[in-house]
Each structure stands twice: as C-alpha cells, then as structure tokens.
Amino acid sequence: MDVCVRLALWLLWGLLLHQGQSLSHSHSEKATGTSSGANSEESTAAEFCRIDKPLCHSEDEKLSFEAVRNIHKLMDDDANGDVDVEESDEFLREDLNYHDPTVKHSTFHGEDKLISVEDLWKAWKSSEVYNWTVDEVVQWLITYVELPQYEETFRKLQLSGHAMPRLAVTNTTMTGTVLKMTDRSHRQKLQLKALDTVLFGPPLLTRHNHLKDFMLVVSIVIGVGGCWFAYIQNRYSKEHMKKMMKDLEGLHRAEQSLHDLQERLHKAQEEHRTVEVEKVHLEKKLRDEINLAKQEAQRLKELREGTENERSRQKYAEEELEQVREALRKAEKELESHSSWYAPEALQKWLQLTHEVEVQYYNIKKQNAEKQLLVAKEGAEKIKKKRNTLFGTFHVAHSSSLDDVDHKILTAKQALSEVTAALRERLHRWQQIEILCGFQIVNNPGIHSLVAALNIDPSWMGSTRPNPAHFIMTDDVDDMDEEIVSPLSMQSPSLQSSVRQRLTEPQHGLGSQRDLTHSDSESSLHMSDRQRVAPKPPQMSRAADEALNAMTSNGSHRLIEGVHPGSLVEKLPDSPALAKKALLALNHGLDKAHSLMELSPSAPPGGSPHLDSSRSHSPSSPDPDTPSPVGDSRALQASRNTRIPHLAGKKAVAEEDNGSIGEETDSSPGRKKFPLKIFKKPLKK
C-alpha cells in the first residue's frame, strides 16, 4: 500500500515538472518570436518605404507588399535576392503545375532575367489587376476561380484588386478567419488562382470568352456546311457520271448496231456472189437443155424427111409440134413473170448519178459523225483520268467539263443514229427503185464515167471527199452498199438477158398492146392498122408479121411448110409485150392449122400449087432453101449480147438450125385436133 502511494506521488511530481519546463520553454519562444516578428516588420516597413515612399504609410499597401515579398521568397530558392530563369521555371512546373510554361515564363521575365522584390512590386502595380474594383474581383471569383458561394463575403469585406496578393500567399488567418473557408481544397484553389493572377495578369478567358465562343460556333457552322456541300457535290458528281456512262453505253450500242449492219452487208455481198455463180450455172444448164431440145427436133426432122409413110411423117410433125408447144409454154411463163414496162437507158444513168451524189453527201455526214464520236471518246477518257487523281472528283464536279462531255456524247450518239438510219433508208429505197425500174443502179461504173456519159460539166459535181481511214470500221460502207444484192440478180436468166439486150439496143420501144383478132377474115394486117401499131424494131416486126401472115385461109400448110414454130421461137422479139403478142398469134395460128388439116384431108403431101404460089409471093415466108435473114440477125445480136462468148456462137447456130426445122412440115388428113387452151391464159399484170 505504501509502495503504491509513493509510486503515484512520484509520477505526479514528474508530470508537474515536465509541464513546468514546457511552459517555460514556450514563453521563451514567444518572446523570441515576438522580438523577431517585430524586427521583420521593421525591416519590411523600411524596405517598403525605400521602394515606394508614397504608399509606405498605408496599412493595406504594407500587407500587400509583405505578401509580394513572401511570393518572391517562395520563388528565390538560393535566397540571393533575385529570381533567375531556372528558379522561375522550376516554380512554374512544381508549384503551379504548368507542363508548358513557355508563354508564362516569357510574360514573367520579359527582357529581365533577374527579378528582385522591387521589380516584382513594380510589375504588380503596373498590372491591370491592381486597379480592379470589388465587382471585378467578384466576377473573377465567379468565372475564373469558380467559387460563387463566397461572393457575399468578398462584397462585405470590400476586397478590391489591392488585396489580391494577400489571397495569393498561405495565410490561415485571412482564409480561415476572415473569409471563413473551411474547405482546404477551396483555400488551395483560391491561392493558386490568385498567385497566377498576381504574377501573370488577368486571365485571357475572362476577356475573350465570348469571342472564342462565337469563333467556335462559326467554325462549327462552316465545317458542317462544308461537309454538307461536299456530300451534295459528291452525290451530284456520281449521278452525273452515271448518266454520262449510260450515254456512253448508248453510244457504244449505236456503234455496235452500225457494225452489225456492216456485217450484214458483208453477208449480203457473199450471198450476191453465190447467187451470181449459181445463175451462171443455171444459164449454162438451160442452154444445154435448149441445145438438147434442138438436137432432138433436128433428129425428128431428119426422120420425118427420110420417111415415106404419111402417118410416120405426121407423127413426127406432131412430136415436133409438141416440143415447140412446150418451149412456147416455158417462154410464156417466163414472160408472164416479168413486168411489161421498161425504163429507158438514160433514166438508168441519171438514177445512177443521183445515187453517187447521195453517197457523197452521206460520206460527208458520216465523217462528221465520226469526228463527233472521237471527240466524245477523248472527253470521256479525260474525265476517267481526272477521277483517278486525289481531288479529281471535286474538280470534275465544280468544272463544266462534265456537262460538255455529256453534251458531246449525246450529239455523237444522235449523229451516229442518224447516219445508221440514213444508211438503212438509202439501201431500202434504192433496192425498191431497182425492183420497179428493172435495172441495176447501185452497181455502176462510177461518178466520173456517168458524168462523161451524160455530158455534164465536172465543175458542177465538185470534188469528192476521201473516206476517213482512222475510223473503227474496216471497210467503206458506201463501197459495200454498192455491192448490195440487187433483186434483179435473183430473177431468171432470161430476164437478165432481156434486160442486157434492152440496154444494148436503146432504140427498142414499147410494143403495141392491141390483141390480135381470131377471125378467119383477118388474114393479114392492113396498112392503116399497121400505122396504128407502135413502131417496132425490124426483128420484132418481122417475127410478128410472120405469125400474122401464117394465119391465112390455108394457114395449116403455111405453118407446117412455110413458117415452122421452132423458127418463130428463135424470131421472137425481145420486148415482153411484143413477145406475148407474137406468141398469142402463133398459138392461134397453130389452132387454125389443125382445124384446116381436118377440113382438107386429101391435100397432097407436097402442098397445093396455090400454096406454093402464095409462098413465093409472100415477103414474110422465106424459101426453105434460103436462110432466114431474121434468124441471122437474131443470131448476130445474141452473140453480141451474151456474156459468155463460147455460148454465143452455139446459140446462133442453134437458132439457124431451129429456124429451118419446120419448113418442110406437111399436113396429113384424119388427124385429131390438139387443144391448145394452155396458151390462152390471161396475162399477169
């Protein structure tokens, strides 16, 4: 018990002793601090009066100067009285947390690399913040410091710009007691913002806030408008390019159609050549058949002449007559298949000249279309090359080259379609003209030969333009359409031979279309009737006169012995109208011959004296022993007109032989009459 009491007393005594020592130590420190504070205040007042004597008696200015001096002391690490560049840079990076203090550093130092307390005070007095009013300080507190809750406190204390340095230093009395800031973060934030404002002046955001906002809004509007404009232009450019590509594809299709038409022309040329070869073979075959028929007729004639039996002679004559009828039937069918009208030769030359002049104008139009096509292609290639560049799309969209190329493509497409349509229409039109006229117009000797043949002044025609060789077409379309298949070459060789003979004999006119009468009283044509008939060539009139003179009262003996049907076939005129007329007359004569043969069965084989006398006095009935001049002239004409020289002589000899087949034909009694109704079919018009 005593031990515990002693221990407690000893501890109490120790505590009292320790407290006494601490109190004595604190009193000594307070005395020392008071004495040092008094000394520092005296030194600060003396320095302030030395630097700024007019303001040294103001207590607020003294407090502000003391705050500026403390700021300078914070920045002066080596305590040499001056703040150099390194010290200020370190202070900005470490204390103010500026990562790029270049602008602030240049603003703080300027041209002076060493900043003293006096320099710092003069810079503060010359600052705009030094002259701030209470309202400006409150505005700075709200906008820059962002502490609007202390606005009333600042207004009550009437803190102006002179008190700003006191806010920039760590002063618990000022911030805690006077401003009543209990939050440490608010005190630190206010200190840093005030320090930045004192050292570097008013913040730029407070002065240029509205301007920057306006510039930002304008920039955003311009950017959005530019993006929208670029989008619209890009879409318009794409649509325009699509349209141009469609037009270009249409131009390619028109060009392809022109190529297809050109290939069709090539095929037509090949078919034309094939038809020409087949036509020559067909002509040769027909000539061979005609020669065989003539040989058979000659054989029957020889058999008839060497037979003494009257029935055998009559039988041979009937067989020969049947062959003649068959030949006449074929000739009639060929004549019925052709038109009865033929244009004159001069019309053919004028139409050929018209075709050549039209070809010249077509070539000019085609050359213009080719030039437009090349220009459009070059423009399209340039547009494609520009699109491959970096700003090619925008350049093409803003320039007028796209519209120009589009217009050129449409113009070239229209011109090419017009040229194609003109080519088709011209080929069809001249084919129809050839069909109606019956001669060839596209295939002609050329414009120079036609001008010379028609005696036209060459200066009227002008100079022909050469065809372009740089175009995509391989051959000249106009040279090909001159070799287009003519409808005349598809027809029978007899028509072509007749057309050829008509071209070589331009003096042949149209024959009379008057039908021959079938009456027995009209044995011969009177002079007045012959004057009413249209003028005929000598060969045509001779053949027609023979057919008409053969139909007399004793026409059976005249037909069989005087004028043989085989010879009349050779003597038929070239004009289809006169040939039909002669065939009808010959057909009617054959019917009358059979009728007279039945009426006079007792006639002698050699014929009556009246028949011989009439034969000798008739100018149209040549003597059997004398060759017919009509046959000779016909043979010479055929030899001149035929295109195959070695067949011309054979044709002439065959015609002379065929002309003498029926000269010795005699009639016999009791023979049946052959119905020849097939020769009386109506003519096709």
Swiss-Prot record:
A motif (Microtubule tip localization signal) lies at residues 642-645. Changing D481A: Decreases fast Ca(2+)-dependent inactivation of ORAI3 channels. Residues 672-685 are annotated as: Required for generation of inwardly rectifying CRAC currents. GO terms for cellular component: cortical endoplasmic reticulum; endoplasmic reticulum; endoplasmic reticulum membrane; microtubule; plasma membrane; plasma membrane raft; sarcoplasmic reticulum membrane. Changing N80T: In TAM1; myoblasts with the mutation have significantly increased clustering of STIM1, regardless of calcium levels, indicating that calcium sensing in the sarcoplasmic reticulum is impaired. Residues 655-666 have a biased composition (Acidic residues). It comes from the Eukaryota. Keywords: Calcium, Calcium transport, Cell membrane, Coiled coil, Cytoplasm, Cytoskeleton, Disease variant, Endoplasmic reticulum, Glycoprotein, Ion transport, Membrane, Metal-binding, Microtubule, Phosphoprotein, Sarcoplasmic reticulum, Signal, Transmembrane, Transmembrane helix, Transport. Residues 248-442 form a coiled coil. Glycans are attached at N131, N171. Residues 344-442 are annotated as: SOAR/CAD. Residues 235-685 are cytoplasmic. It is found in: Cell membrane; Endoplasmic reticulum membrane; Cytoplasm, Cytoskeleton; Sarcoplasmic reticulum. Transfection of STIM1 into cells derived from a rhabdoid tumor and from a rhabdomyosarcoma that do not express detectable levels of STIM1 can induce cell death, suggesting a possible role in the control of rhabdomyosarcomas and rhabdoid tumors. It is linked to Immunodeficiency 10: An immune disorder characterized by recurrent infections, impaired activation and proliferative response of T-cells, decreased T-cell production of cytokines, lymphadenopathy, and normal lymphocytes counts and serum immunoglobulin levels. Additional features include thrombocytopenia, autoimmune hemolytic anemia, myopathy, partial iris hypoplasia, hepatosplenomegaly and defective enamel dentition. The microtubule tip localization signal (MtLS) motif; mediates interaction with MAPRE1 and targeting to the growing microtubule plus ends. This is Stromal interaction molecule 1.
